[in-house]
Amino acid sequence: MNPLKNLSLCMMACIGMAACSSNQQQETVSENLPYTVIPFEKGVENEKQVKLSDIAEKITFVPMETTDASLLNKVRANNIISVNGTIVIPCFNMGAFAFDESGKFIAPISRKGQGPGEFTRFLSVAGNSDRNLIYVKSSRKMIAFRPDGTFVNEYKVPGIGLPWEYSIIMQDSITLSNIINATGQSQYRLILSNTQGDTLKAFPQYDRFEMPYGMNYAYCNNKENYLYQYKGESVYHDYYCDTLYTVTRDSLLPRYLLDMGKYKLPKNMRLEVAIV
């Protein structure tokens, strides 16, 4: 099944998934492996309908307050986040807007400009509830804000590859950025950098391919987020990679392996070599 890409704004802002119970037939853990193997092929053969009420403890409809200062346009629905009850809604090249849990508008998060706390090109948002911070990704920098819109700090990020590549803050002084393999020949896939944008560690990209004649870039999508944080860990999953990793300062640790079986996509059938 294909994931639903465009959920309504209110649903994205208010649905809370409290707990999910896994079907044991869908996951297997080998005693010799440090990660969980998810047998996709077997799961497809046993496909069944699941009601939202089976996996969600509570559903709340939250209308967003509409004011002259909070008019939303071109919402990045897949990048809506929540930080300690503050709902942050990003809009393409407009910045982000903060609302409380009742939908009342709080403040804009960053604005376009060239000064401290301002972006030249708005790309995405990330959050850290432990630090009570919201991060705005702009070209070559991450900007930190409090949920009330107060500017806190800026972090430089490496200017490598495409401008919309995603970044998150692993620690107070370390930024993790992904490199989209848009040419098929990227040397690295993840970069750890300090607050000045200097590279601390680079993780190699092993998935290489040749570009078809007449193409400049392979498949890439500025609406996809390959990095996120979950329970204090930084998580990474690339577009065509079958493994989900957690990232530390020193290594990539495999957590889940999606065993596609006969559904594994051949390299020559990938979107990146099929789009002309």
Q: What residue spans do the PLM features occupy?
A:
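Sec-dependent bacterial lipoprotein signal peptides
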Residues: 1-18
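Eukaryotic scaffold repeat domains enriched in small/polar residues
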Residues: 20-276
